[in-house]
Amino acid sequence: MKISPSLMCMDLLKFKEQIEFIDSHADYFHIDIMDGHFVPNLTLSPFFVSQVKKLATKPLDCHLMVTRPQDYIAQLARAGADFITLHPETINGQAFRLIDEIRRHDMKVGLILNPETPVEAMKYYIHKADKITVMTVDPGFAGQPFIPEMLDKLAELKAWREREGLEYEIEVDGSCNQATYEKLMAAGADVFIVGTSGLFNHAENIDEAWRIMTAQILAAKSEVQPHAKTA
């Protein structure tokens, strides 16, 4: 499993310590950018991305929960982003243009699905994605309850990838923790975005929190059984 800590959940008073630790242990940094319109919250910014970039060597994945993603792509490229992750709900009528713009800036393309958005919504450009993320909670806030129906969506993405010979990673955003790791792996997840319940709330010390998380993931991995689709 790959791990992508969500920086909206980190302790900003320990910014340097936690960024440096995550950089030496994780696979990605997950950075949520919200505009207060697409979701009812405001979080991180292109400036924040630029500050993380000063300390980070691992890829910075910027999740755009904004109504106008086209306004952020060039800013985030300048700030040092490596991935731009887009919601199909916000790119209708400009999906191909925005994906091409991300590529022109030498960044990778992520697509992310809200719980109620079907995989079919990105049928005509799914092959252009480097990573596809499934929201397993309603977007906008940390610490929300897991939506079990999303396990079928993960299994659908895995089957689509195999059927079409695609190579995108399958990522999960929302309530990735001890209670869900086994089910998520069984359904086809490759990457966990970990936040409050999965990482940062385990201990004051990031080193100890990471140790606890890793032990939980390894224990879940040993119990994984194939996911059975629900009716």
Swiss-Prot record:
Binding site for a divalent metal cation: 30, 32, 63, 173
Pathways involved: Carbohydrate degradation; D-allose degradation
Cofactor(s) this protein requires: Co(2+); Mn(2+); Zn(2+)
Pfam family name, one: Ribul_P_3_epim
The keyword Manganese is annotated on this UniProt entry: yes
A GO cellular component annotation in the UniProt record: cytosol
Reactions this protein catalyses: D-allulose 6-phosphate = keto-D-fructose 6-phosphate
Gene3D superfamilies documented for this protein: Aldolase class I
One GO process term, biological-process aspect: D-allose catabolic process
Molecular functions (GO terms): allulose 6-phosphate 3-epimerase activity; D-ribulose-phosphate 3-epimerase activity; metal ion binding
Keyword list, A-Z: Carbohydrate metabolism, Cobalt, Isomerase, Manganese, Metal-binding, Zinc
Subunit structure as annotated in this protein's UniProt entry: Homohexamer. Trimer of dimers.
PANTHER family found in the cross-reference section: RIBULOSE-5-PHOSPHATE-3-EPIMERASE
The protein's name in its UniProt record: D-allulose-6-phosphate 3-epimerase
